[in-house]
Structure formats: C-alpha cells, structure tokens
UniProtKB/Swiss-Prot annotation:
Family: Belongs to the gamma-glutamyl phosphate reductase family.
Bias type Basic and acidic residues, positions: 1-18
Molecular function per GO: glutamate-5-semialdehyde dehydrogenase activity; NADP binding
Protein name: Gamma-glutamyl phosphate reductase
Amino acid sequence: MAIQDEMRQVAEGAREASRTLSRMPTEIKDRALKEMAERLLQQAGWLMQENEKDVAFAKNLGLSPAMIDRLTLKESTIRDMADGILEVASLPDPVGKVTSMWRRPNGLLVGRMRIPLGVIGIIYESRPNVTADAAALCLKSGNAVILRGGSEAIHSNIAIGRLLKDVLKETSLPEAAIQVVETTDREAVYELLQLEEYIDLIIPRGGEDLIRAVVRQSRIPVIKHYKGVCHVFVDADADLEMAAKICLNAKIQRPGVCNAMETLLVHREAAPRFLPELARKLRESHVVIRGCEETCALISDAEQATEADWYREYLDLVLSIRVVGGIEEAMDHIARYGSLHTESIVTNDYANAQRFLNEVNSSTVLVNASTRFSDGFQLGLGAEIGISTTKLHAYGPMGLEELTTTKFIVYGNGQVRT
C-alpha cells in the first residue's frame, strides 16, 4: 500500500475511534489504563530487549549521549511510565465537566462543557516513554492518538504500542484509539500533516529542525513544544547554599532534558561569593562553563561565551553564566534569549520574587526551586503530553485538561430570537 493511502487509512480509523471514545464512561477508560500499566511492568524485560536494538543502532550512528539517554529504557524508566499511567487513571476525567453556568436576561441558561479535541497526531524523537505517556493522556481525555516516533526508537515504540493495543482489544474501547506509525519513511510524516479533515491537532516534540519542519509543512494546527533555554537567576540576597543546590540539580541531574538549566544569571553583588565555589562543584561533574567577561574573571577555566551561546539549548554538561546588575537586567536577558519554557529566581526578597513571577512571560516560572520541576508529573498533572511554548490553546506542561476544549451548552424553554 502506498504511504499516502496507508496514512489516510490510519487517520480515518482514528477519526472513527474518536467518536466512540468521546462517549466512553470514565470507569472503562480507567480500567484499561490500569491494565496498560500492569502490562508494561509484566513485559519490562521484553521492552528492554527491543529497546537495546534501538540503543545499539543509535550508538552506531554516533548520536549524542543526551539523545541516547532519552532513548534508553531501564527498569526504572518503565516503572516511571507505568506510574505515570496510573497517575492519569487516578485523575478526574475532564470530559463532560461543566466549567461555568450563567442565566441570560431572556431566561436561557448558558454553560461551558469540556469535550475532547478529537484526533491528535504526535511527532517525536528519541523518547519511547512519550508513546506510553501520550497514549494514556489521550485515552483518558477521550482523544484518539496517532503516534509517530523517530526512526532511532522504532523498535521500542512499536513494542510499547502493541502492548497498549493488546489491552484495547480486550476491552470495549476502539482498537484504533491508539495507533503507532510503524514505518520509518519520512514521507509518512508529510502525509499525516496534510490530513486536516481527519486530524484536529499536531504536537511535535523534538529538536528545532523537527519542529520547524512540522510547522512549515502542516495544514493542521500545531502546538509547538520548542527548545528549553531555561534560566536560573540568583539574586543579591539569595541563600547561596540553597542556590547552589538548586543550580546543581537543574544542570546536572539530567542535562539532556528540556527543563534542565542552560543559562545561569547571577547578581553582581552575589557573584564573587557564589560563583567560584559553584564552579568547583560543577567541575566535579565535568560541566563546561561558558561565561561573560566578569564570569571568566571569577572562574579561571571558564570559556568565553559567544552571542550564540546565550540562545543555545545544550542538552549536555555545558552551562552559560552571565553576571547581571540586578533583576531588571536578568529579566531583559531572559526576554531576549529565552524560549518561553522555564525560569527560576532564587531570592529572599519577596518583592523581587513577585516581580519575577508577574513579569517573566515563560510557561513555568518558579521561586526558590529547580527548573526540573517544570514537568507534568511533578506539577500534579500526571504524565504530560509535553511542555507547550505556544501560548494559543495551551501553555506549559500539557495534562488532561489541556487536551480538551469547551463547547457551549444552552438550556431554554421555548425562547426564539427576536
């Protein structure tokens, strides 16, 4: 079958499944989700065997350590996937929820009710866990999903997808509610992006090149999950011990993820007391520092940062550091170089904390906490579909409610328009 026909068949199946799924009772969806979580744990050994094929191929291709880290499935990763699905099952079902009601002067009772978006296409790279997370969120929110992962994770994605579909076959849920595109042919992505009559939304997750290509080619609305140039600003009166703990966690715990800190901004008054000791701790973890002139004067082995470095999402053990004159300069830097993802301020100044929260326009803004908390699971949303940097429809970590929209419902007793 030609790729064009195959993708149309997939999309037609998803559209039909979405109609059935949208009216499924919460109990049936939750029962299926719990069984999916159990199935992942039961088949963890097989999943890791399939994943090893992808990891070996990725190493032969010379993919970066950050890419390989995101690609690798371990027992702990699979357990986290299962926990994420169980968390989704435990959350309230947004479908059918009436968010507000009001009465008009003519007696009409008007309200808003949450409904699924319909069919969602997700295009992603190197992250097999997205297959499980996205499938769970879409199922619970009543959406059919078409999942197209990167060629580097094809064995892992197919394996996870088949386990999830096996559960659907054992329930009254439509089998086409979850579909993994099993071809690595790039033409499949292009063909999916043309099917606006079947697919309601496209969510790309991956590198800049992928996201730009999807936005350029798609005839379907796109919510971008763009790069994470995340900042931490250490204020003049910050608790420096706490600041060091936050910075080390934000940079070192998992440098290859989008909510890792990429640029550190330090108030000029705190820099001499803070940066030399922080640099020593960063050095122990093999972090390369690229700094402004003032940073290089305080850290002897720091490399001179270029203009391009301030825009860069390293996804690696590399950190840009700039010394700034205060909160105004820090916020100006974030506004110029940031990617609207996640920013944190470390401060004991309440006014500065509130100003940072109010004026920094990124999708997640934190006070005295690591950027690593910009995550659906950590914020109580359950597994997330991703972190949107598109302000229209959804902004920040996307959980269940962000995968629904609202329709107007109106109760009357014979009113007619005059």
